């Protein structure tokens, strides 16, 4: 893929990077953006219990040493984004063994708490979360002039985050099976604003969708 990208001078976005080995070829390219996911930065293959299919995802979770290399690449900028890859499913689809179980992890509601705990434990400046989870994704989407920053002329898309709040009592997404243990990730979103309009506050959601087409 890297050779094709370089040959044609095209732009390439690598999604859900789980293997740090792949970075050796991507580092040589220009016009390449890379994302990874909270589960690749949290779990390690050595720690997954036998038959625990709630950890199955694609690409798979890899070894502890690989996880640390992903963190190093994220901090130095070789990986620019952290995205949820939220992929929930009914519990029945996770039954059976790893060969037949659904491959996906539900994490959308917990993503900020997970990453907040990681940067705190690793001594990373919290402002890096803004880069990885807001500013850089906005730039990739071609919206750096409108999204991803608190500045004049930008949409007032805001999250009111309380790092000292108790973990959520329940998950809001429909299919709640997840390998994460919510009680291990304190903090909660108190409110969310979209273009200045409050769409969420302490478990209550806006009654009508307020999304808009950003680019034709």
Task: Pin down the residues of each PLM region.
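Histidine/acidic residue-rich metal-binding segments in metalloenzymes
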Residues: 1-82
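His/Asp/Glu-enriched, well-ordered alpha-helical/loop segment
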Residues: 4-9, 81-82, 87-164
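Short, well-ordered beta-strand elements within core beta-sheets of diverse protein domains
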Residues: 11-14, 56-62, 116-121, 141-142, ...
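Residue-level signal for inorganic ion chemistry
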Residues: 12, 35, 85, 115, ...
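Short, conserved clusters of charged catalytic residues that mark active-site
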Residues: 21, 65, 132, 145, ...
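Short glycine/proline- and charge-enriched loop/turn segments
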Residues: 48-56, 93-101, 173-176
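A short acidic, glycine-rich active-site loop
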Residues: 55-66, 102-106, 179-185
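C-terminal cap of metal-dependent C-N hydrolases
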Residues: 97-100, 152-214
């Amino acid at each position: 893929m890297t050779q094709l990208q370089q040959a044609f001078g095209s732009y390439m976005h690598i999604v859900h990077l789980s293997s740090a080995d792949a970075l050796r070829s991507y580092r040589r390219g220009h016009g390449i953006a890379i994302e990874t996911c909270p589960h690749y930065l949290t779990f390690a293959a050595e720690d997954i219990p036998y038959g625990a299919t709630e950890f199955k995802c694609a690409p798979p979770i890899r070894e502890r040493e690989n996880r640390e290399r992903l963190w190093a690449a994220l901090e130095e900028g070789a990986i620019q984004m952290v995205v949820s890859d939220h992929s929930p499913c009914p519990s029945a689809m996770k039954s059976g063994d790893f060969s037949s179980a659904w491959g996906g992890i539900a994490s959308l509601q917990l993503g900020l708490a997970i990453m907040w705990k990681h940067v705190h434990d690793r001594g990373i400046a919290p402002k890096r979360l803004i880069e990885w989870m807001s500013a850089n994704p906005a730039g990739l989407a071609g919206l750096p002039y409108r999204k991803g920053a608190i500045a004049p002329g930008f949409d007032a898309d805001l999250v009111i985050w309380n790092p000292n709040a108790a973990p959520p009592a329940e998950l809001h997404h429909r299919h709640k099976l997840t390998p994460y243990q919510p009680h291990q990730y304190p903090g909660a979103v108190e409110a969310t604003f979209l273009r200045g309009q409050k769409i969420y506050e302490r478990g209550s959601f806006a009654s009508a969708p307020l999304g808009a087409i950003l680019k034709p």
